Amino acid sequence: DYVTVKGFSPLRKA
């Protein structure tokens, strides 16, 4: 999973 407009990196693989 990846978040763009949250608090993580734009290409953060979760």
From Swiss-Prot:
Keywords: Secreted
Cell location: Secreted
Disulfide bridge positions per record: none
Similarity section: Belongs to the bradykinin-related peptide family.
Tissue and organ expression note: Expressed by the venom gland.
Additional remarks: Both alpha- and beta-scoliidines are the two major peptide components of the venom. Cleavage products of these peptides have also been found in the venom but are not shown here.
Protein name as annotated: Beta-scoliidine
Gene Ontology CC annotation, any one: extracellular region
Keyword Secreted tagged: yes
